[in-house]
């Protein structure tokens, strides 16, 4: 069944200025509406490496919801476990500056409680034969608990990402049961009640290693934008992964692609350092295009001996 990805679907509304962006002022520009959401992006990123993930989530019972399912199907994502419900998708509104970075954003989260019933009814079928689980940690607490129970039952690795750290903080204790947690530098500061914005990778790496040990978190990766990423494991192993140098067009989805690449590597036999390198390559490929997911790759390009199923 490949990697199972569990999470929410969003509609991304993105505004780009046509001239110099003026904070607080009126800006002429263009507005785009695309399918988004951390987990939806992750599922499509995995599929774009010619792997065949399964997406477990919700969409609206509207034409837009059908469009989301159809696009995922076209990318060879298994959509059997996507439910269509009223208000099943959230909305993310973002304004970009001239460097392609988000300078303001606001989101409306969907109601994901129907996932609880879905996992109760079909959880065994979903998780029994999967290769690993990629989980959006800020889902309903019961959904996270259910996923971790199934993972323990069937001996599956669980990798977690977050879209709203304020909500995920309420699930902080679950991190001790997560095989690897990926977040950005700002989110790491929230997680450990500190400010890491001024830290360079070398110092961030040392701080992270101390934190995962004291918090009993098995493994954690922190992305640092154009400074790359750092990783640390509870056994003391830690390191730095430099960022790829590319021309920035749109940073949307770069973190999701990094997470997808890291999960792919860890699932199919790579070390944590090698997996982060795959994540770094996928993130770089997203930054230099207007799409919020990576372009098509083949597993062999990342040294993965995984059969491509057409």
Regions found by a protein language model. Name each.
Residues 1-70, 74, 92:
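Glycine-rich phosphate/adenosyl-contacting loop at the front of the ribokinase-like
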Residues 3, 27, 194, 198-310:
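Conserved phosphate-binding/catalytic region of the ribokinase-like
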Residues 71-86:
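A glycine-rich helix N-cap at a beta->alpha junction
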Residues 84, 94-132, 137:
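Conserved phosphate-binding/catalytic loop of the ribokinase/pfkB sugar-kinase fold
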Residues 125-126, 173-174, 213:
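Structural alpha-helical scaffold elements that stabilize or flank donor/cofactor-binding regions
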Residues 132-206, 227-228:
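Conserved beta-alpha-beta core of the PfkB/ribokinase-like small-molecule kinase fold
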């Amino acid at each position: 069944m490949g990697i199972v990805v569990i999470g929410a679907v969003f509609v991304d509304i993105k505004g780009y200025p046509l001239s110099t962006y003026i904070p607080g002022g009126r800006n002429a520009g263009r507005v785009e509406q695309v399918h988004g959401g951390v987990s939806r992006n992750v599922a499509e990123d995995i599929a774009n490496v010619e792997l065949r993930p399964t997406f477990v989530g919700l969409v609206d019972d509207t034409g837009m919801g059908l469009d989301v399912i159809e696009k995922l199907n076209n990318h060879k994502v298994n959509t059997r476990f996507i439910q269509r419900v009223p208000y099943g998708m959230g909305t993310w509104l973002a304004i970009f500056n001239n460097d392609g970075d988000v300078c303001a954003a606001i989101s409306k989260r969907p109601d994901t409680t129907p996932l609880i019933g879905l996992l109760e009814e079909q959880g065994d079928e979903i998780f029994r034969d999967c290769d690993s689980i990629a989980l959006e940690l800020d889902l309903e607490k019961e959904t996270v608990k259910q996923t971790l129970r199934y993972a323990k039952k069937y001996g599956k690795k669980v990798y977690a990402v977050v879209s709203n750290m304020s909500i995920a903080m309420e699930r902080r204790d679950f991190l001790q049961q997560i095989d690897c947690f990926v977040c950005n530098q700002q989110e790491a500061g929230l997680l450990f009640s500190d400010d890491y914005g001024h830290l360079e990778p070398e110092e961030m790496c040392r701080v992270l290693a101390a934190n995962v040990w004291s918090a009993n978190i098995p493994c954690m990766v922190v992305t640092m934008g154009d400074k790359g990423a750092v990783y640390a494991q509870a056994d003391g192993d830690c390191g730095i992964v430099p960022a790829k140098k590319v021309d920035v067009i749109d940073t949307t989805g770069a973190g999701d692609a990094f997470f997808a690449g890291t999960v792919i590597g860890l699932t199919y036999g790579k070390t944590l350092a090698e997996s982060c390198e795959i994540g770094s390559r996928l993130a770089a490929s997203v930054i230099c295009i207007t799409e919020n997911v990576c372009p098509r790759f083949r597993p062999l390009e990342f040294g993965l001996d995984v059969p491509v199923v057409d």
